[in-house]
Amino acid sequence: GLGDVYKRQAGKKVFIINCHGCKEVRFPEKEAVELQKELSAEGNVTGIMTTDYICNPENMQLRLQKHMDKIREADLVLVFSCGVGVQTIAEYLEDKMVCAACDTYPVPGFQGVTPLEYKCDQCGECYLNLTGGICPITACSKSLVNGQCGGSKNGKCEVDSEMECGWERIYRRLKEIGRLDALKCPTQIHNFATDDELK
C-alpha cells in the first residue's frame, strides 16, 4: 500500500505534493487522503500542495516557490503523481529526498506535458524511492535495477557512448542527499511478464 513508502522514513517531517493534472492518470485520491490525514495527525506534515501538471517545470517551480519555507522544514518530499512528476520534483529539489507515493501503470501513448527528457516506463514497480528520483529502468540502457553493470567508461554507457551512465547519476544523486544507504536495500527484480502471462 501507499503507507509502505513512508515506513522507512517513520517519524521524519514530510512535505506532500499532489498532482491532479492528467485526466488520463487515475489519482489514488481516497488512499492519498487517508495517508495524509494519518501523517498530519502524527504532526509529521510540514505542508501540503495540490496542483496540476507538476511535470511542467515552469508551473511546478512557481508553485513550489510559494511553499519553500515548509519544504525546507521537511526531511523528505512525498509526491502523489506519475513517475515523470516525481523526477521533475527531484531534479528541482536537489537537496531533498523525494519519494514516489504511488506506482505508475501504463497509459498507452501518454507521458504528461513536460518538454524535458524525464522518462517513466510506467512499469507499476516504481524504484524512484531507492534511486534518488532517477529511474533506473529508463536512465540505464540495460534497465538494470540492482546497480551498475561495470561496463561504463568515463561515466558513459558501454551500449551508447553518448549516454551518461544511469547508475553513476543515481550514485551521485544519493551521495548529494546523504542517502547512499539506499543502495544497500534489497531490490525486487523487475517483473517483465505481460498481462496475458499473469492471467
Indicate residue ranges for each PLM-predicted region.
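Short, small-residue-biased leader/transition segments that mark boundaries at the very start
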Residues: 1-6
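Short hydrophobic/aromatic-enriched beta-strand-loop microsegments
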Residues: 96-103
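Activity-critical C-terminal alpha-helical subdomain
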Residues: 94-95, 127
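A short helix->loop->beta-strand "cap" motif at the edges of active sites that frequently abuts
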Residues: 44, 95-96
